């Protein structure tokens, strides 16, 4: 999949770059209009940067938060890594890149989740407000 995705810039007018295990991710995120990545702590980095994302979960503990943020129009959840095809990623990329208004709306929603200079207390409060309480029999 990585080989195919890394060739995408050859067949599109969009400026698409593939970065793996990047040590300058914050710098790249400031310049990006859309990110494809995993869930987990990257969600909060993307939100504080107001960066829309296509998210592919790579661990079970990323799924629920990703679904929740997807419902809030912060990202588009594509699925778990072993269930997402190159075609799925390509279609989602094309859909968003051809709709600047969707990207802008997602960016606004992301920025509301973690406003600049808000820090951990704000993130924690918002995450807790989005989580549904467990029924007593599951607690």
Walk through the language-model features, giving the residues of each:
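Nucleotide-activated sugar donor-binding and catalytic core shared by glycosyltransferases
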Residues: 2-139
